[in-house]
Structure formats: structure tokens, C-alpha cells
């Protein structure tokens, strides 16, 4: 069993695997370490990764990318609408307010949710891992942005289930980076006090910042901060808008009106950005951008930095917020690490160096650090790996509260159940006085931390039904968990009834102020007094809990999505097999045409050559016309038809070559047996020599007969016949050589024609 870490980025994906000697990043079929996060739909087949990226320019409306911007989101969210205006593919709103991606596939318009598309991408990454490792892949850790909401995290788990993966954890990107950094940095724990490191991850579509502390054998994330809408693609968009305006004035073309032109210009702008990261200036040249017009332009790094000034200023905000939430001063920070695909712009490094008053570190691989950290975490969680003890404490970036039909539920100190910065996984136990079915709701306590129009409600839980015999002497204990994935769940609800006379009014939980006690698992209810005075329970009963979780697929929906994915995989495999058979037929036609003109020319008659040449030409024309899009069986039948004509000629040629070698082998067998016969008694020696002479004479006669025939005639002497003769000679000579008595001479017994031989004894 393998343990794998997946970094599913907005632009690219990276796969890392934990091995005994360390962490390795896997290569795809193109020998690249990064896999484009794209899924493209052809007429009858899907294409993933690099194959999808290759078709993005030609088929933009059927190529899906930037899934992280859509997963677990609602169609009408402002951020989603801003993104959809940039995407070339068609979308619509489903019945639940979610997003549906519409495209043409298998001759009809089909709809897919972002969860289904992500499931396809994860399935592709899983296939790459299994092909490289030559073993099934199931257990994994998947990196996610720290700002993902509960519904987005659930969507990732659903997508992983569709792909046949079992995530042991959804891990924050920056936490994974910190783990991969800290577990190898033994110098960080030289001092007795913690070492504080800031990690800034500027990705394709977002910026994440975290402050982590490192001690001997452990790390803790003290704060997370982020800008959901600031990444490398925004700097690309600055260049795109600049050149689009310039081309409108210079060439009188409006690229905004042409989908393919937009895709091509954005791809070129990304290349220009990379050139400007290492050079002071860059050129842009695109042939036939639109209206058959070639465009060219030029930009300097200084101009690009001026155009990006607003974006650079926005980078300061999450950095300052992360530092403030950590409660640390700038002087306490040991170092600052900069990672992410968008971190290579010189102006970004310069601005952040000025902010933190130090040079930025780049000691981790900017593109692979998340995947490597996820693989490490997977190894720690998997039972099949032994990893040295290293504790990872992550913090949750949102404050989560609970409420019931009687009002908000807080801790005895009047705090939220899971305040912002809560270390998770975390379990709290609520002790409530209820007499019948009730409902709990989980919600984000601060809507300002969320994107606009994202609902604050997370999920609701119906607890019950249940029946109690002593109403005033019963309590319901609810076990609430913020689990390893950062998802809010209720593990269990238990009804506990006590002896009525053992319960005083002070021992009951007062809910007049709409509060209940909340404590960590295993601690005492503050209202219950000491352990010795705790009333004795007379009845415990598990209460059913029904969750209504926003953003999660139901069991039926998940099962249907899995079945649909399986059918799509079967179709892909069918098309790949059909493509292989078509390529095999095409290769066979070209190969045989060449051999008929050269290798097989002398072994075929004139009429055979003409017939085969005509058939090969007809097959080639069929391939490029009527047979361009045929079934797998059609290609197999065509190949068999051509082979029926070729096989006799091919057999003549091959048998002619093999006949020469078989003759040499028979002559060697004859020589070997003659040499072995020298050590035998005279009668057996003569018998062996006689058999060798017969075989030699047979070969000479047959060879002479064969050589008298033309090369294009069917052979009279076949190589298989010669090999059988050699085997028979060996067997006969071996039989004679092992006999205990010599062969008997013929004797006259009665009449002249009557002969009798002695029986031979075998060893």
C-alpha cells in the first residue's frame, strides 16, 4: 500500500509519494512533475492533464480549468460571477443554486458539477500514481486552501470518493508547507524557545499566509490569513487587459469578443510574465490572433510593475493580518519563506522584503512543497509507515458557533465552541436539558471573514426522537467535533437519566440564559460538582442524529456520480483501445508496403505483389475517409483481411531464414552425435553412425530439392520439419547410447525371409 500526497492547484497538480528513503515527486507520461489541472471533453473521449491542456486553445468551450474557484460554491456568489466572465466554458445554475458546467459530449449537451469534474481530475492523478508505483493507491492526503468553507471541504471529500480515494486528511496548503519545512530543520529547535517562521504562498488564484512555531518534535500553526482573489493569474490579467486595449487601438481588433483569441492572449501573457521575472523587458508575438491579423508588442518590467501596483499593495494585508493574529511582533519572527507559482515576480520579493525587513527565504521547492508535506502527513497517519514522532497542530481560520431552539450555545466562560484559531481536530461535549427532539445549528460566527453572499449557516442536526421517564432528571450529552478535515460534525448524542432524588436544583443545567456547558472530552461538567458527588446514572441511551449538511452529496447522489464516472472511464478505455487498433492498422499498412518493395519482393509472385499493393492502397484510403471514425472491431477485421494476404509471403520469407539456421543446427547435431559415438562399443557406435548418415543424406536430398524451386514458391522443406528431424535423431542416438546390450544382428530362423531381433533392455 502506498501513501500519497496530492496538491490539487488551480493551475497545476503535483503528486508526491512517501518511500522508505524519503519523499519523491512522481512524473507523468510526458516526464513532467506538474500536471495541468484541466479536463477536456472530445466528441467521444475525455482528456486529462497535459492532453487537456493541448486541446484548450482549439476547444476552449469543452476544456474545464480553475476548478478551485468553483468547487463548493454557489452560482450567484459575486466572486463566482467574476470568475465565470473569464472562463470560456458555459455554465448555469442548478436547482440547489450550485454550478452546472454545460458542454457537448457524445453528440449531446451534458451537464457536470464541479465536484464531478474534480473527481475526474483526481481519478487521473490516481492513475498516474498507480502506473508509477505499480500498486493500487487509496490512502492519501489532499492539500486545500486554508480559507475553504465547510461545504468546499465536503465537496473535496465527495470528489475523492468518486475517484476511489480515501483521504486520511484534508490539509491546509500552508500547513503542509510548514510540515515539509520543519521536520527536516533540526537547527530550528537548537534553542529552548519556539522558532517562529512566516510562510507566504502566492498561488495561481490566491495568497495564503501562515505563522508557525517549531519546537523539538512538534510544530504549531499560530495563525492563518489569506486573500482568496489575489494570485499569479491576476498579474496575468493585468497584462491581458493592457495588451487587449493596445491591440484594439493598434490593430482595430477586440479580443474580448473572441473566445479563442482570449485563451491564446492569456497564455501568451503568462509567458511574458515569466520572461519579465528574469529579464528587464519582453516581447509578445502572436500569429493570426483574430481576423487573420498577426500582433506584436513590447513591455518593460517597470511598466508591468506600475500596472500591478494595486495588486502588490494588496499583498501586504494578509501578511499583516497573519502577524497580528499570531500575537507576535516582527522582531520575534526568525525567517520568512516565500513559495507558490506566483512568487517569482521580482516586485513581490522586493515589497515583502521591505515589509518584513529581511531577505526572504526560498529553501523549499516553490511548486512541490505542498505535495511533499501532504505525503509526509499521509505517512504519519498511515499504519503501514513508521515515521519519527512529530506533532502537527493546525489552527482553524474561522470562528464557529452553535445554537439550539433555546438560543446560542457557549462555553462556561461565554465563548464560542470553536473560536477562531482553534486547534483541530477538537472535540467538545455539550450537556443539555431536553425532554424531546431538538435541533442544533452550526454557523460561522463572523460573516466578515467569508466571501460576500456566502451563507453563515454550516449545517443543522436533528437530535431525536427520544423518550424520558424523569424529565427533570435527564440530560442529553452531545459530542461535537471539528474533525481532521476541518469539518463540523456531531459524533453522537446520548440520553442520560439519573435517580430523581439524587439531583438537586443546583446540579441541573440552567438554560434560562440560553447557554449550556461545553467542555473538552473527558472533563467534568462544571455544574455537576465533584466526582464523588456526581449522581449515578440509571439509564444511558444513544439518540439518533440526522445531519442536514449544506454542500454535501447524498448517498444516492454520490452513488450515481460514481456510476457515471465508471461509465465515462469505460468509454475512455474503449476509445483508447480503438485508437490503438487504428494505429496498429495504419502502421501495418506502411510497414508492409515498404517490405513488399524490399524485404519480401523476391518471395512473392508478381500477381501477389499487385494484389497486396492494391489492397494496401484501398485500406489506406479507407482509413482516412470512411474508416476515420470506426469501431474497434472494424479496424481488427481490416487488419485481419490484410494479414491473410501477407501471411503466406511473410511465412515464406521467415521460413527461408529459419531453414538455413535449422539446417546448421541439424548438421551440428549430427556432428555432436558422431563425436559422442566414439566412446561407445562398436555395435552401438555403428548404429549411431548409421542414423547420423541417414539424417545427413535426408537433409542433402531435401535441400537440393528445395533449392531447385523459385523463392516465390511454397517451400517443400520447412524449418519445422528440419527441427523435428534433429529432435528425432537426438532421441534415437540417446536411446542407443543408453542401451545395456548392443543391437542384435538379424538371424535366419527357418525360412530365408523370417527374422527375429533380441529385446533391448533400458536403463
From Swiss-Prot:
User: What cystine linkages occur within this chain?
Assistant: none
Task: Give the Phosphoserine positions (modified residues).
Answer: 528
Coiled-coil-forming residues are none
Basic and acidic residues: bias regions: 701-714
Q: Which GO terms describe its molecular function?
A: ATP binding; ATP-dependent protein folding chaperone
Tell me which UniProt keywords the record has, alphabetically: ATP-binding, Chaperone, Nucleotide-binding, Phosphoprotein, Stress response
Top-rank taxon, per record: Eukaryota
Q: Where is this region: Disordered?
A: 509-529, 701-763
Q: Which SUPFAM superfamilies does this chain map to?
A: Actin-like ATPase domain, Heat shock protein 70kD (HSP70), C-terminal subdomain, Heat shock protein 70kD (HSP70), peptide-binding domain
Key word Aminoacyl-tRNA synthetase present = no
Keyword match Metal-binding = no
Which PANTHER family does its entry note? HEAT SHOCK 70 KDA PROTEIN 16, HSC70CB, ISOFORM G-RELATED
- Spell out the family assignment given in the record's similarity comment: Belongs to the heat shock protein 70 (TC 1.A.33) family. HSP110/SSE subfamily.
* Protein's name according to its UniProt entry: Heat shock 70 kDa protein 16
Q: Which organism is it from?
A: Arabidopsis thaliana (Mouse-ear cress)
Amino acid at each position: 500500500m502506498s501513501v500519497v500526497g496530492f496538491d490539487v492547484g488551480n493551475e497545476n497538480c503535483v503528486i508526491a509519494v512517501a518511500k522508505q528513503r524519503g519523499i519523491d515527486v512522481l512524473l507523468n507520461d510526458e516526464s513532467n512533475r506538474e500536471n495541468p489541472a484541466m479536463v477536456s471533453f472530445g466528441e467521444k473521449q475525455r482528456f486529462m492533464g497535459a492532453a487537456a491542456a493541448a486541446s484548450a486553445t482549439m476547444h476552449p468551450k469543452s476544456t474545464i480549468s480553475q476548478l478551485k474557484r468553483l468547487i463548493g460554491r454557489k452560482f450567484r456568489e459575486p466572486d463566482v460571477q467574476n470568475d465565470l466572465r473569464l472562463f470560456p466554458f458555459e455554465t448555469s445554475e442548478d436547482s440547489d443554486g450550485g454550478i452546472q458546467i454545460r458542454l457537448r459530449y457524445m453528440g449531446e449537451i451534458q451537464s457536470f458539477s464541479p465536484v464531478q469534474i474534480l473527481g475526474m481530475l483526481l481519478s487521473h492523478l490516481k492513475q498516474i500514481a498507480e502506473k508509477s508505483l505499480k500498486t493500487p493507491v487509496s490512502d492519501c492526503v489532499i492539500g486545500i486552501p486554508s480559507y475553504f468553507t465547510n461545504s468546499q471541504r465536503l465537496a473535496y471529500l465527495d470528489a475523492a470518493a468518486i475517484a476511489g480515494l480515501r483521504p486520511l486528511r484534508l490539509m491546509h496548503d500552508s500547513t503542509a508547507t510548514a510540515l515539509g519545512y520543519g521536520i527536516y530543520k533540526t537547527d530550528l529547535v537548537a534553542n529552548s524557545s519556539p522558532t517562529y517562521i512566516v510562510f507566504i504562498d502566492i498561488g495561481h488564484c490566491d495568497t495564503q499566509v501562515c505563522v508557525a512555531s517549531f519546537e523539538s518534535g512538534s510544530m504549531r500553526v499560530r495563525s492563518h490569513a489569506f486573500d482568496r482573489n489575489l494570485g499569479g493569474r491576476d498579474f496575468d490579467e493585468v497584462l491581458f487587459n493592457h495588451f487587449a486595449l493596445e491591440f484594439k487601438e493598434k490593430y482595430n481588433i477586440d479580443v474580448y469578443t473572441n473566445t479563442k483569441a482570449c485563451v491564446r492572449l492569456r497564455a501568451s501573457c503568462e509567458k511574458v510574465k515569466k520572461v519579465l521575472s528574469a529579464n528587464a523587458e519582453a516581447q509578445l508575438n502572436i500569429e493570426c490572433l483574430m481576423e487573420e491579423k498577426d500582433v506584436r508588442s513590447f513591455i518593460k518590467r517597470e511598466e508591468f510593475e506600475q500596472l500591478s501596483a494595486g495588486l502588490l499593495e494588496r499583498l501586504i494585508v494578509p501578511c499583516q493580518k497573519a502577524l497580528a493574529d499570531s500575537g507576535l511582533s516582527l522582531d520575534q519572527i526568525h525567517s520568512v519563506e516565500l513559495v507558490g507559482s506566483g512568487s517569482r515576480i521580482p516586485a513581490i520579493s522586493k515589497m515583502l522584503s521591505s515589509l518584513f525587513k529581511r531577505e526572504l527565504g526560498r529553501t523549499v521547492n516553490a511548486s512541490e512543497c505542498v505535495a511533499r508535506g501532504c505525503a509526509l502527513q499521509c505517512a504519519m497517519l498511515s499504519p503501514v509507515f513508521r515515521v519519527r514522532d512529530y506533532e502537527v497542530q493546525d489552527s482553524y481560520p474561522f470562528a464557529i458557533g452553535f445554537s439550539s431552539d433555546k438560543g446560542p450555545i457557549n462555553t462556561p466562560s461565554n465563548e464560542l465552541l470553536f473560536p477562531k484559531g482553534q486547534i483541530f481536530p477538537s472535540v467538545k461535549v455539550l450537556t443539555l436539558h431536553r425532554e424531546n427532539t431538538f435541533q442544533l445549528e452550526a454557523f460561522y460566527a463572523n460573516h466578515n471573514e467569508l466571501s460576500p453572499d456566502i451563507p453563515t449557516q454550516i449545517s443543522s442536526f436533528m437530535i431525536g426522537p427520544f423518550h424520558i421517564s424523569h424529565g427533570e432528571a435527564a440530560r442529553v450529552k452531545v459530542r461535537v467535533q471539528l474533525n481532521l478535515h476541518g469539518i463540523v460534525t456531531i459524533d453522537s448524542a446520548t440520553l442520560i437519566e439519573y435517580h430523581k432524588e439524587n439531583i438537586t436544583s443546583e446540579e441541573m443545567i440552567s438554560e434560562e440564559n440560553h447557554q449550556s456547558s461545553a467542555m473538552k472530552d473527558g472533563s467534568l461538567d462544571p455544574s455537576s460538582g465533584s466526582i464523588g458527588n456526581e449522581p449515578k446514572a440509571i439509564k444511558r441511551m444513544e439518540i439518533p442524529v440526522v445531519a442536514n449538511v449544506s454542500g454535501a452529496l447524498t448517498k444516492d447522489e454520490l452513488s450515481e456520480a460514481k456510476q457515471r464516472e465508471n461509465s465515462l472511464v469505460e468509454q475512455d478505455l474503449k476509445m483508447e483501445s480503438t485508437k490503438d487498433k487504428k494505429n496498429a492498422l495504419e502502421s501495418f499498412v506502411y510497414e508492409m508496403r515498404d517490405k513488399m518493395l524490399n524485404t519480401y519482393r523476391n518471395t512473392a509472385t508478381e500477381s501477389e505483389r499487385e494484389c497486396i499493393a492494391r489492397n494496401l492502397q484501398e485500406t489506406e484510403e479507407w482509413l482516412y475517409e470512411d474508416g476515420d471514425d470506426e469501431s474497434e472491431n472494424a479496424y481488427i477485421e481490416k487488419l485481419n483481411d490484410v494479414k491473410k494476404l501477407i501471411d503466406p509471403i511473410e511465412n515464406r520469407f521467415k521460413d527461408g531464414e529459419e531453414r538455413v539456421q535449422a539446417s546448421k543446427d541439424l548438421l551440428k547435431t549430427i556432428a555432436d552425435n558422431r563425436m559422442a559415438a566414439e566412446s561407445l562399443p562398436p555395435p552401438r557406435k555403428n548404429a549411431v553412425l548409421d542414423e547420423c548418415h541417414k539424417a545427413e543424406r535426408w537433409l542433402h536430398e531435401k535441400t537440393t530439392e528445395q533449392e531447385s524451386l523459385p523463392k516465390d514458391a511454397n517451400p517443400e522443406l520447412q524449418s519445422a520439419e528440419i527441427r523435428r528431424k534433429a529432435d528425432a535423431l537426438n532421441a534415437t542416438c540417446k536411446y542407443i547410447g543408453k542401451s545395456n546390450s548392443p543391437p542384435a544382428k538379424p538371424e535366419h530362423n527357418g525360412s530365408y525371409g523370417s527374422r527375429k531381433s533380441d529385446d533391448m533392455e533400458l536403463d
